[in-house]
Design a protein with these regions (language model features):
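Short, acidic, Ser/Thr-enriched surface-loop or helix-capping motifs
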Residues: 25-26
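Active-site-adjacent loop/helix segments that line or gate small-molecule/cofactor pockets in enzymes
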Residues: 1-22, 67, 157
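Short, glycine/acidic-enriched loop or turn micro-motifs at the edges of active sites
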Residues: 36, 161, 182
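Short secondary-structure boundary/capping elements
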Residues: 15, 46, 72, 157-160
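Conserved PLP phosphate-binding loop immediately N-terminal to the Schiff-base lysine helix
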Residues: 179-185
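A secondary-structure boundary/capping signal
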Residues: 19, 34-36, 123
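Glycine-rich loop-to-alpha-helix module at the N-terminal edge of alpha/beta enzyme cores
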Residues: 2, 30-115
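PLP-dependent aspartate aminotransferase-fold enzymes
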Residues: 77-175
Length: 185
């Protein structure tokens, strides 16, 4: 028996390792990792340069708070800013955390502009994550069930319906949260 919380209905396979785009189960069978570890392992599994970089970093310092300067983070931030043309970057661990930050930044922007109840436009049937704010933004009742009351401030419109977006556009709309590549929803 596993003592892990049952957050998903697990499939009857256990992977032991991966190489490139393949993962291997306990019997040694290989599978194409078409999910890329749910978009976490987009560089593949066990790439020698990535393994070395992680091992080197773990051999120096594994983690410290971002209240301290971290040279490698600053170098990555500089490179991402140069490539994107942006002034600053926000590094995080997951898409859900990125969406939470986007929601908070949009609301903060709204409040700075004097908007008491900033609204964020989201798409029906979209998936944005499983934290309280992101599942509130998610347009799937099944994902939201049991977590009420949900976070307010989201306005839903159908995908690919510009007229619907224009109809709800109001002075309190501060952002559109849209994930153009949908893996769930």
């Amino acid at each position: 028996m596993s003592h892990l919380m049952n957050t998903y209905a697990r499939l009857p396979v256990a992977f032991t390792h991966g190489q490139g785009a393949k993962v291997f189960d306990e019997a040694g069978r290989s599978y194409l990792d078409a999910l890329a570890g749910i978009a976490v392992s987009t560089l593949g599994h066990a790439h020698p340069r990535l393994v070395k970089a992680i091992a080197d970093q773990a051999g120096r310092i594994l983690h410290t708070s971002n209240i301290y300067r971290i040279r490698e983070q600053e170098q990555l931030g500089d490179r991402l800013a140069a490539l994107s043309g942006m002034d600053e970057v926000f590094l995080c661990n997951s898409g859900c955390e990125a969406n939470e930050a986007a929601i908070k930044l949009a609301r903060m922007f709204g409040h700075q502009k004097g908007i008491d109840s900033p609204a964020i436009v989201v798409m029906e049937k979209a998936f944005h994550g499983r934290t309280l704010a992101t599942l509130s933004a998610t347009g799937n009742r099944k994902v939201q069930a049991g977590f009420e009351p949900l976070v307010s401030g989201f306005v839903r419109v159908p995908f690919d319906d510009l007229a619907a977006v224009e109809n709800i556009a109001a002075n309190n709309v501060v952002a559109v949260l849209l994930e153009p590549i949908q893996g769930e929803g």
